[in-house]
């Protein structure tokens, strides 16, 4: 096996329970985003664009759709004879096996996979964030600082800092303290869930952590505090670009809406840093003469006879006459009948919304009444004349 300087390990087994019905049958990294992508596309594309050609993808919760989607990695130019993408679910060894117990345990269980490439460094990534980042620049920073570990950080609003792992740093960016979701944060430098470690050193810490029966087997709760306590050289790598944790319905909806700004901070048209995906084969979209479309993304295979304002339509969506879609995300192959109103909502794949339905905010509601997002599960039928109020999750019948 050809030696690799750095191996990337992408943690993609999370359930994303705060996304409700959107992750009922999908792992969080497989959730659709931006009209034609899935969340994991951003991390995989970052790897390719950064020149990292060996990526292990660790899956666990509802892995079928994600495994099928990734395949051999060809859509991200990661189908290589030496390296490329390898999907790594939990497995059974001679001495038994178990589910991944935490982020650190997931890497521990795949030490043999990493070791076969004899890397000097390991890049650990989360598969459930939306951002574009050149990991090679972070690796250069890691080498320049002669670091044992480097953690990518971004400044977050102070009122949100308690929801993240927070770094306190010296003037030279060396990390002097790490707090996991502190109640009263002393800094607003949040961990992005992107780490570079010297592999042999990390491996020793993973093995030590595994021997501790009281450990949560987690990087934020266990590995990073242990390394700090031991005085290892740990540095914070500042990231200035767009980054969003889409772990809630509201944050996922907002990240989609961010794409519709006149000058979006996340530019999907950047030819120098393309985001790759598995693209469905659909005919061109059609917008009828009577339709009105404003500030929206309309994808292949869509048939629009109604009105679409500030919304994103995934491939194969039909919008009937007299219907209005406003500030919403409509996933693939949804069929919306006539005289339907959908406002500030996310509608799941292949759902049918029959005529005269109203989903989300009522017209002329005050902004405070429309601050929460309505979600409709995929593969269900919403009967004629239904009213689904704001801040609801509409779930189909079991079975």
Swiss-Prot record:
Family to which the UniProt record says this protein belongs: Belongs to the bacterial/plant glucose-1-phosphate adenylyltransferase family.
Enzyme kind, highest EC tier: transferase
Residue sites binding alpha-D-glucose 1-phosphate per the record: 100, 165, 180-181, 191
Gene: glgC
Alphabetical GO biological process terms: glycogen biosynthetic process
Pathway: Glycan biosynthesis; glycogen biosynthesis
Entry-linked PANTHER family: GLUCOSE-1-PHOSPHATE ADENYLYLTRANSFERASE, GLUCOSE-1-PHOSPHATE ADENYLYLTRANSFERASE-RELATED
Protein name: Glucose-1-phosphate adenylyltransferase
Keyword line: ATP-binding, Carbohydrate metabolism, Glycogen biosynthesis, Glycogen metabolism, Nucleotide-binding, Nucleotidyltransferase, Transferase
Record's subunit section: Homotetramer.
Lineage: Bacteria, Bacillati, Bacillota, Clostridia, Eubacteriales
Record's function text: Involved in the biosynthesis of ADP-glucose, a building block required for the elongation reactions to produce glycogen. Catalyzes the reaction between ATP and alpha-D-glucose 1-phosphate (G1P) to produce pyrophosphate and ADP-Glc.
Organism of derivation: Desulforamulus reducens (strain ATCC BAA-1160 / DSM 100696 / MI-1)
Record-listed E.C. numbers: 2.7.7.27
Swiss-Prot/TrEMBL catalytic activity: alpha-D-glucose 1-phosphate + ATP + H(+) = ADP-alpha-D-glucose + diphosphate
Keyword Phosphoprotein: no
């Amino acid at each position: 096996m050809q030696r690799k300087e750095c191996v990337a390990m992408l943690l993609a087994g999370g359930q994303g329970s705060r996304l409700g019905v959107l992750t009922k049958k999908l792992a969080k990294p497989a959730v659709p985003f931006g009209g034609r992508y899935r969340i994991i596309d951003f991390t995989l594309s970052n790897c390719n664009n950064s020149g990292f050609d060996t990526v292990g993808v660790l899956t666990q919760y509802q892995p079928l759709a994600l495994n099928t989607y990734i395949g051999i990695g060809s859509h991200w130019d990661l189908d290589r004879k030496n390296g490329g993408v390898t999907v790594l679910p939990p497995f059974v060894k001679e001495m038994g096996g178990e589910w991944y117990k935490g982020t650190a345990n997931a890497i521990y269980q795949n030490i043999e996979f990493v070791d076969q490439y004899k890397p000097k460094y390991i890049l650990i990534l989360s598969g459930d964030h939306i951002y574009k980042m050149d990991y090679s620049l972070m690796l250069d920073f890691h080498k320049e600082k002669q670091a044992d570990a480097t953690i990518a950080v971004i400044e977050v609003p102070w009122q949100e800092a308690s929801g993240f792992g927070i770094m306190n740093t010296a003037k030279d960016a060396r990390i002097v303290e790490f707090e996991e979701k502190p109640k009263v944060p002393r800094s607003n430098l949040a961990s992005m869930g992107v780490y570079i470690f010297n592999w042999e050193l990390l491996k020793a810490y993973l093995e030590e952590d595994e021997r501790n029966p009281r450990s949560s087997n987690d990087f934020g709760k266990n590995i990073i505090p242990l390394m700090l306590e031991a005085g290892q050289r740990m540095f914070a790598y500042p990231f200035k670009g767009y980054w969003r944790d889409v772990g809630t319905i509201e944050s996922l909806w907002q990240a989609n809406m961010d794409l519709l700004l006149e000058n979006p901070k996340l530019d999907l048209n950047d030819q120098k840093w393309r985001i790759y995906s598995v693209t469905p084969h659909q005919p061109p979209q059609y917008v009828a003469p009577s339709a009105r479309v404003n500030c929206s993304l309309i994808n292949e295979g869509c048939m629009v006879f109604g009105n679409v304002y500030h919304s994103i339509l995934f491939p194969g969506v039909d919008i009937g006459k007299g219907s209005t879609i406003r500030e919403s995300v409509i996933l693939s192959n949804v069929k919306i009948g006539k005289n339907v109103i959908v406002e500030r909502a996310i509608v799941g794949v292949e759902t049918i919304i029959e005529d005269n339905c109203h989903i989300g905010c009522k017209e002329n509601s005050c902004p405070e009444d429309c601050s929460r997002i309505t979600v409709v599960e995929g593969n269900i039928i919403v009967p004629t004349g239904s009213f689904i109020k704001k801040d609801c999750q509409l779930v189909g019948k079991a079975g």
